[in-house]
């Protein structure tokens, strides 16, 4: 299956976690990927690994908190490949020590958190839309989070910014659909990325597993498969949607077995 043959795909935060899995999935289907990551060292190493396997990829430094870096990423891609068919806005995150509950969160962190999770997605999309329009169409896939749909005891800024990503997805889809540009989002739940494995102990993982409808937690490749589907022609009649990838975590109230 070569759904991305002759396609140029930008993936932000591409050197690790969901981004790396998405990169592997797309190059396995013939896509050429710009590996944009804050860690140039990791991006270079990842690109070398994929290139040795025959993939056509380009690593580039990218800082999601700098608008200048967003513009440089698009310029780099056009210089290297001359086209952009898919943009995957994957990069995001938060600082748990500063992004707490509404009473105690650090408001000085607001701009950085929203720039990382929302402004970057908006600006990169703004930059690629004219390019995609000139080419006759394209795809944008945003990585949101179930934190943008539900709420938690902490991570207030993260949740609010990811909710913005979900609604931004609808706006982009509405405003660019007639230009043959689709825009969708994925909202992962707990995914066993290296970061999650390092920061969440076994007890926490068991709690999440107990509330999932599936007998297992998600892996990065589960999200990557969904992103690849949305970015491909298989999803040609889907736009403005957010696909939740959480093993059914958010489909029900907290439950216990009384039998």
Swiss-Prot record:
Protein function: 7alpha-hydroxysteroid dehydrogenase involved in the metabolism of bile acids in the gut. Catalyzes the NAD(+)-dependent oxidation of the 7alpha-hydroxy group of 7alpha-hydroxysteroids, such as cholate, chenodeoxycholate, taurochenodeoxycholate, glycochenodeoxycholate, taurocholate and glycocholate, to the corresponding 7-oxosteroids.
GO molecular function per UniProt: cholate 7-alpha-dehydrogenase (NAD+) activity
A Gene Ontology BP annotation from the UniProt entry: lipid catabolic process
Parts forming coiled coils: none
Field pH dependence: Optimum pH is pH 8.5 (NAD reduction, bile acid oxidation) and 6.5 (NADH oxidation, bile acid reduction).
Induction: Up-regulated by cholate and after the transition of the cells from log phase to stationary growth phase.
Record organism: Bacteroides fragilis (strain ATCC 25285 / DSM 2151 / CCUG 4856 / JCM 11019 / LMG 10263 / NCTC 9343 / Onslow / VPI 2553 / EN-2)
EC number(s) reported in the record: 1.1.1.159, 1.1.1.-
Cysteines joined through disulfide linkages: none
Residues that hold NAD(+) according to the record: 18, 37-38, 90, 158, 162, 191-193
UniProt lineage: Bacteria, Pseudomonadati, Bacteroidota, Bacteroidia, Bacteroidales
Keyword Iron-sulfur: no
Residues bound to glycochenodeoxycholate: 145, 158
Positions marked as site (Lowers pKa of active site Tyr): 162
Keywords for the protein's UniProt record, in alphabetical order: Bile acid catabolism, Lipid degradation, Lipid metabolism, NAD, Oxidoreductase, Steroid metabolism
PANTHER family xrefs: DEHYDROGENASES, SHORT CHAIN, ESTRADIOL 17-BETA-DEHYDROGENASE 8-RELATED
Reaction equation(s) it catalyzes: cholate + NAD(+) = 3alpha,12alpha-dihydroxy-7-oxo-5beta-cholanate + NADH + H(+); chenodeoxycholate + NAD(+) = 7-oxolithocholate + NADH + H(+); taurochenodeoxycholate + NAD(+) = 7-oxotaurolithocholate + NADH + H(+); glycochenodeoxycholate + NAD(+) = 7-oxoglycolithocholate + NADH + H(+)
Marked site (Transition state stabilizer) residue numbers: 145
Temperature dependence: Is relatively thermostable, retaining 95% of initial activity after 1 hour at 65 degrees Celsius.
Active site: 158 (proton acceptor)
Origin superkingdom: Bacteria
Name of the molecule in the record: 7alpha-hydroxysteroid dehydrogenase
Major enzyme class: oxidoreductase
Family the entry assigns: Belongs to the short-chain dehydrogenases/reductases (SDR) family.
Quaternary structure and partners: Homotetramer.
InterPro entries: NAD(P)-bd_dom_sf (IPR036291), SDR_fam (IPR002347)
């Amino acid at each position: 299956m070569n759904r991305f043959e002759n396609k140029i795909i930008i993936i932000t935060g591409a050197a690790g976690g969901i981004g790396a899995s998405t990169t592997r999935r797309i190059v396995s289907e013939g896509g050429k990927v710009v590996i944009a990551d804050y860690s140039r060292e990791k991006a270079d190493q990842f690109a070398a690994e994929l290139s040795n396997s025959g993939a056509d990829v380009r690593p580039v430094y990218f800082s999601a908190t700098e608008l200048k870096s967003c513009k440089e990423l698009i310029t780099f891609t056009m210089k290297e490949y001359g086209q952009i068919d898919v943009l995957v806005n994957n990069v995001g995150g938060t600082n748990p020590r500063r992004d707490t509950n509404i009473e105690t969160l650090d408001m000085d962190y607001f701009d950085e958190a929203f720039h990382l999770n929302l402004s970057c997605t908006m600006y990169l999309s703004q930059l690629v839309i004219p390019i995609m329009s000139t080419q006759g169409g394209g795809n944008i896939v945003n990585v949101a989070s179930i934190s943008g749909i539900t709420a938690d005891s902490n991570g207030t800024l993260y949740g609010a910014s990811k909710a913005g990503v979900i609604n931004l997805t609808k706006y982009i889809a509405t405003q660019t659909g007639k230009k043959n540009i689709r825009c969708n989002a994925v909202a992962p739940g707990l995914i066993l990325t290296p970061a999650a494995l390092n920061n969440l102990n076994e007890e926490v993982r068991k709690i999440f597993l107990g509330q999932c409808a599936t007998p297992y937690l998600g892996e990065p490749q589960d999200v990557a498969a969904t992103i690849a589907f949305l970015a491909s022609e298989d999803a040609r009649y889907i736009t403005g949607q957010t696909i939740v990838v959480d093993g059914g975590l958010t489909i029900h109230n907290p439950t216990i077995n009384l039998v």
